[in-house]
Amino acid sequence: MSLPLNNFKRALAEGKPQFGLWAALADAYVTELLATAGFDWLLIDNEHAPNDVRSTLAQLQAVAAYASHPVVRPVRSDSALIKQLLDIGAQTLLLPMIDTAEQAADAVAATRYPPQGIRGVGSALARASRWNRIPDYLNTAADELCVLVQVESVQGMENLSAIAAVDGVDGVFFGPSDLSASMGLLGKPGDASVREAIRNGIQTVLRAGKAAGVLAPDPAIAADYLEAGATFVAVGTDTGLLSRAAADLAASYKKTATMAASPKGGY
């Protein structure tokens, strides 16, 4: 039995654009459906969506047969949470609210076994090692792990060069909503000054030889960030897609019914 390859990590290293979708409905059936839609990656969100370890496990199992790569975001960058997510088989993590190089280094250390890091050894109980059926898992696991850190504050942007330079960080993801709030522009992630900060940040990350990512549901803004050099871009959320489609469908039928009930001219 072989260690699963992380083709998403390879794509980022090769600079191939990867388009993703937020999976926030916290349901394995929905996430499996999304995995058939053609996205390169899906973000299983534990920070703002009602997920836990078991629901995340179910979603990892649900998408395992498909090409869409699961990226898991814990509620915070915490070594115990990281250990649990890695043990259930997550190979790519998006770690939120990273403000300093020290925090980024701690995040990387949490994904590595000693002596390179502090990840606890429990491979006999872990789906990730296929319950010790993957030969030499302990020595090879890190080769297929992708560590993405999320920079989403003024402090993080000030420390961006140092964060991106941390060994073991594969990419930096910018969070426009929290960044805009930190800049005093709450609720304005598309503000020109926020976009300029992110464009400059993308260049900083690229100079460090790392991949840059961002959430950009607006096609024009997404195109702007891609032109700036972003590699992995989340272009929407499942909640947004469902909410808009449901509202549009209801509105279209109400409009049809209203037109049908309107008085008609005639004799």
Curated annotation (Swiss-Prot):
Q: What's any one GO cellular component for it?
A: cytoplasm
Is Lipid biosynthesis given among the entry's keywords? no
Location of the active site: 48
Q: Which reaction does it catalyse?
A: D-glyceraldehyde + 3-hydroxypyruvate = 2-dehydro-D-galactonate; D-glyceraldehyde + 3-hydroxypyruvate = (3R,4S,5R)-3,4,5,6-tetrahydroxy-2-oxohexanoate; D-glyceraldehyde + pyruvate = 2-dehydro-3-deoxy-L-galactonate
Q: Which GO BP terms, alphabetically?
A: phenylacetate catabolic process
Annotated site (Increases basicity of active site His): 87
- Please name one Pfam family that this protein belongs to: HpcH_HpaI
In this chain, the site described as Transition state stabilizer is at 73
UniProt xrefs under Gene3D superfamilies = Phosphoenolpyruvate-binding domains
Top-rank taxon: Bacteria
Key words, A-Z: Lyase, Metal-binding, Pyruvate
Q: Which GO terms describe its molecular function?
A: 2-dehydro-3-deoxyglucarate aldolase activity; metal ion binding
Q: Which residues bind a divalent metal cation?
A: 152, 178
Named cofactor requirement(s): a divalent metal cation
UniProt EC number: 4.1.2.-
**Family membership noted in the UniProt record:** Belongs to the HpcH/HpaI aldolase family.
Q: Which NCBIfam families match?
A: HpaI
Q: What is known about what this protein does?
A: Aldolase which can catalyze in vitro the aldolisation reaction between hydroxypyruvate (HPA) or pyruvate (PA) and D-glyceraldehyde (D-GA). The condensation of hydroxypyruvate and D-glyceraldehyde produces 2-dehydro-D-galactonate as the major product and (3R,4S,5R)-3,4,5,6-tetrahydroxy-2-oxohexanoate. The condensation of pyruvate and D-glyceraldehyde produces 2-dehydro-3-deoxy-L-galactonate.
Tell me the protein's name: Hydroxypyruvate/pyruvate aldolase Bphyt_5830
